[in-house]
Amino acid sequence: MNSICLNFRVHLPYYYKKYHFFDIGVNHDYYDTLRCESEVKRVSERCYLPANKLMMTLLERYPERFSFSLAISGTAVELLESYAPEVLESFKELVSTGRVELLATPYHHSLASLQSSDEFKCQINLHREKMKEVFGLNTTTFANTEMVYADYIGVILSELGFKGVLTEGAKHVLGWRSPNYVYSNPIAQNLKILFRNQSLSDDIALRFTNSYWTGYPLTAEKFADWIIRDPNHRSITLA
């Protein structure tokens, strides 16, 4: 039986105001709250609400065959709490089915893993606490910002108790190996590594609407056929 591991990532940033020289030391209100609210509501109406509705339909239609993982940044949760609580509720409903795994991620969607291990650990712990507070779940799998990964990051994750990590299936890293298998960190071998299938993921994320692409238009049937024809299609991670 072939398995397809679906991962969706949700991040919303805070937007800053135009901050003038003469505001320094006088005005400490840095965020553009009107823009934050507008952007959150726009993406909620155009993306999150319809997508979550579709996901719930699929979960109900295929109770034994469909599940997925979800990585939501801490700032995304904060902004949804403030400006689109109905969206956060829809995420909670998905998670409550028991077939949506929450992944840990840096709280602020930062690249702390490349600069400071202490800050990296701090943001991971903050995020885990937020997921426990909002969704009532403990996270055991990690997805770094932009799927950045190195063996030393894997060691940190293992020390924090993670069982798995999701990362980019970069060709210069994998070489002749297929991304469609589960690997282990060579130092912390209890940490399992899932590599994103770069080609198939980008077919959906980047090339789907490109009318000049040789695979256009991409249909569900065509995509499924590509997966079946892949000689190394045991476990394909799409993110």
Features from the language model and the residues they span:
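Alpha-helical packing segments of well-folded alpha/beta enzyme cores
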Residues: 47-58, 90, 123-131, 149, ...
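A structural motif corresponding to the C-terminal end of an alpha-helix
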Residues: 48-67, 93-100, 133-137, 229-233
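Alpha-helical scaffolding within the catalytic cores
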Residues: 53-54, 82-95, 174-188, 218-227
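N-terminal regions that are enriched for targeting/export leaders
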Residues: 1-63
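Metal-dependent polysaccharide deacetylase catalytic core of the NodB/CE4 family, i.e.
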Residues: 68, 72-146, 189-209, 237-239
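A short acidic (Asp/Glu
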Residues: 16-19, 79-84, 114-116, 150-158, ...
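Catalytic grooves of carbohydrate-active enzymes
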Residues: 2, 11, 35-45, 190-239
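Catalytic domains of cell-wall/extracellular-matrix polysaccharide-remodeling enzymes
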Residues: 125-181
